[in-house]
Design a protein with these regions (language model features):
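Intrinsically disordered, flexible peripheral segments
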Residues: 19-376
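Cleavable N-terminal signal peptides of Sec/SRP-targeted secreted and luminal proteins
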Residues: 2-18
């Protein structure tokens, strides 16, 4: 039943975005989303942002979908709302319908991209720059014990509050990986500023057959992107897995409070760590879970000339990571480039300034861990 409702809502959204209508000075007119900034316009329509072309016409798809798919009851009073599991960010990921619905939302963007012309060899090629090889350390995943302080979520009496010795910790097993480095050997015939894009994706399907590149392109995840200055001749670019635009495990409130108080007493220096963002992709999830015998994946590295983005940052880096600001760009190339469009001819995709490298991800058995995992 819920799957049917999800498809119905998604179908209505598809009809709405097929012929975008914008309102200006009370006059409605159609908008061609296949022109410049059309992808952003499509995102505004689906997300129902304040700057959407016509909020009253398109409505709030995701908000309504969460209410309908979550079987939320209509509140009898504005202050007596009973939100469903899907309407809580903390619990939405536990409902299978969440993934079905957002897979459909993602499909709209992929469908949009499928109507754009494929990249030509000339567009992808960077004359004079060649990636000779990519060397990657051994990749290992494992589950470790992650402990976090939940004291603030519990009620304590005045005596316990004054003593400040009442602590409750929760322990959870989370996927992690052994930090690794990779080296990119690049030959350049000139001094030039470039942008490296590093992707990781599967190679074989569940039957052990190699996945065609055009079908497999949506499975590649960009986990690193950085600007680098190439010198004339051979360049060895070394990069660590901790250097990407990812988020490390957060410092607990108690630990942060203790550091601040110690700094105020002159017992230690308090350093503002700007690398600790409140939102972003967790660094511990860079690698998918491997197998004990090893699971084959593919590294893909692409080099393009560096061109400064026209979007200037509009957020304060001290208090925000800039997620959702629309200004976190290294250059003007689209997200996921060059996998964002259909690959019509594979021979035009394999340019000298790109490189596929097979890697094997191993998973460390639980019995080899420092702390064995109890069975629940």
């Amino acid at each position: 039943m819920r799957t049917t409702i999800a498809l119905l809502l998604a179908g209505l959204c598809a009809l709405a975005i097929a012929t975008p209508v914008q309102v200006k000075d009370g006059v409605q007119y159609r908008v061609n989303i296949y022109e410049k900034d059309g992808f952003d316009l499509l995102g505004k329509v689906i997300e129902s942002n304040p700057d959407s072309p016509n909020n009253r016409f398109y409505g709030y798809l995701q908000v309504i979908a969460h209410q309908v798919l979550g079987y939320s009851a209509h509140p009898v009073h504005q202050y007596k709302v009973q939100p469903s599991v899907l309407e809580h960010f903390e619990t939405a990921l536990r409902d299978p319908i969440f993934y079905q619905f957002y897979k459909r939302i993602t499909y709209y963007f992929l469908k949009y991209k499928s109507h754009l012309p494929h990249y030509t060899y000339k567009q992808l090629n960077y004359p004079g720059v060649t990636i000779d090889s990519v060397n990657v350390d051994k990749l290992v995943t494992f589950f470790d014990k992650f402990e976090f302080d939940i004291t603030n979520a519990l009620y304590v009496n005045e005596e316990e509050y004054v003593k400040d010795d009442f602590q409750v910790w929760a322990r959870q097993y989370r996927l992690n990986y052994k930090p690794f480095t990779y080296k990119i050997n690049v030959n350049s015939d000139k001094n030039t500023d470039v942008v490296f894009r590093v992707f990781l994706g599967p190679k074989y399907d569940e039957q052990g057959h190699e996945i065609p590149l055009n079908e497999n392109r949506i499975n590649f995840v960009e986990f690193d992107k950085f600007v680098y200055t190439l010198k004339t001749g051979m360049n060895v670019v070394e990069r660590n897995s901790r250097e990407g635009e990812t988020v490390k495990d957060r410092t607990t409130y108690r630990a942060l409070y203790q550091h601040v108080m110690s700094a105020l007493k002159g017992q230690e220096e308090f350093h503002l760590d700007m690398t600790e963002a409140h939102n972003g992709f967790p660094n511990r999830f860079i690698l998918p879970m491997g197998k004990v015998s090893g699971q084959v994946y593919q590294f893909y590295v692409y080099v393009s000339p560096y061109q400064t983005s026209h979007e200037k940052p509009t957020f304060d880096k001290i208090i925000s990571a800039g997620v959702g600001s629309g200004t976190r760009y290294v250059d003007d190339l689209p997200f996921g480039y060059p996998f964002d469009r259909q690959i019509k001819y594979e021979h035009t995709f394999f340019v000298p300034n790109s490189h596929f490298e097979d890697v094997v991800i191993f998973h460390k058995p639980q019995v080899d861990l420092k702390y064995p995992v109890e069975q629940h």
